[in-house]
């Protein structure tokens, strides 16, 4: 009888040590896998940040806005007869956004008779949705006055449209302000209903927390880590099952030891 008691006691200690070793193994593997997964996620986030910075780098070749100045000078040529011929360049500068200044210098030519001829270059500036300043020499006053009148009209229309947009935004934002306290008042009566049933709120929180784990596992699967796809959930389930089995075995062994010690 003493031999049976000693064997049962030895068996009890063997079960206890075996269970402790198994739990330590599974806990260590679970911690290591979680640590590796966190490192991989941090590396993936760093890679995405570097890619976004590289994509947002500005190109030196393309300029969206700025100022451009073009100077065009006329060329003169003289012949043996004393006649001079002048060639005048034409400037056609287009800018997407910004300010443009084009200065054209007039050319003079003299003949043997003492007569001077001056020629002025022509500028054809076509800015698109920009403010253009072209101080070219005044050829005719009517064209310049018409041009400034057109620009003033367009500026007036732009200011009127901006004022209308501001008025529309103010009218749209006005009635929205009093709606917020109504929603707050509507949400306040629902609070005491959840206080009455504590279990309902607990179940609701568990339901909300459950899909987050599934989303993490799905992200890992989509990233291409097939080895660790769903590793966290499987380890949790395995560790919980093994812990429950170990506790059951320990309880059985303890009852056996006590029964042998008391009744025998």
From Swiss-Prot:
Biased composition (Low complexity): 70-81, 102-145
Pfam (any one): MSA_2
UniProt GO cellular component terms: plasma membrane; side of membrane
Region (Polymorphic region) residue spans: 44-190
Stretch forming the signal peptide: 1-20
Keyword flag Transmembrane: no
Lipid bilayer topology: Lipid-anchor; GPI-anchor
Disulphide bridges: 221-229
GO biological process: cell adhesion
Keywords: Cell membrane, Disulfide bond, Glycoprotein, GPI-anchor, Lipoprotein, Malaria, Membrane, Merozoite, Repeat, Signal
Lipidation (GPI-anchor amidated asparagine): 238
Sequence repeats: 60-91, 92-123
InterPro entries the UniProt entry points to: MSA2
Composition bias type Basic and acidic residues, residue spans: 154-166, 217-226
Region called Disordered, residue ranges: 46-227
Prosegment residue ranges: 239-264
Residues carrying a glycan: 22, 36, 213, 238
Positions of region (2 X 32 AA perfects repeats): 60-123
Compartments where located: Cell membrane
Residue stretches of biased makeup (Polar residues): 82-101
Domain notes: The N-terminal region appears to be involved in lipid binding.
Entry function: May play a role in the merozoite attachment to the erythrocyte.
Protein's UniProt name: Merozoite surface protein 2
Lineage: Eukaryota, Sar, Alveolata, Apicomplexa, Aconoidasida
């Amino acid at each position: 009888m003493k031999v049976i008691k000693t064997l049962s006691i030895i068996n009890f200690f063997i079960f206890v040590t075996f269970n402790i070793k198994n739990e330590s193994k599974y806990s260590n593997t679970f911690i290591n896998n979680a640590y590796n997964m966190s490192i991989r996620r941090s590396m993936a986030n760093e890679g995405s940040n570097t890619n976004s910075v590289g994509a947002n780098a500005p190109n030196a070749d393309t300029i969206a806005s700025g100022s451009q100045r073009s100077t065009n000078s006329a060329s003169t040529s003289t012949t043996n007869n004393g006649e001079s011929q002048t060639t005048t360049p034409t400037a056609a500068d287009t800018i997407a956004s910004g300010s443009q200044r084009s200065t054209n210098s007039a050319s003079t030519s003299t003949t043997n008779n003492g007569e001077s001829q001056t020629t002025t270059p022509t500028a054809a500036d076509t800015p698109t949705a920009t403010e253009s300043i072209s101080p070219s020499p005044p050829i005719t006053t009517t064209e310049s006055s018409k041009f400034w009148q057109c620009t003033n009209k367009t500026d007036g229309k732009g200011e009127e449209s901006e004022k209308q947009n501001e008025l529309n935004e103010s009218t749209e934002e006005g009635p929205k302000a009093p709606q917020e306290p109504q929603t707050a008042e509507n949400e306040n009566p629902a609070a005491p209903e959840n206080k009455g049933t504590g279990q309902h709120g607990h179940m609701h929180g568990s339901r909300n927390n459950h899909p987050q784990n599934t989303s993490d596992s799905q992200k890992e699967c989509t990233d291409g880590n097939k080895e660790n796809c769903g590793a966290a959930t499987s380890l949790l389930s395995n560790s919980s099952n093994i812990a429950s089995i170990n506790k059951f075995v320990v309880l059985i062994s303890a009852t056996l030891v006590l029964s042998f010690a008391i009744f025998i």
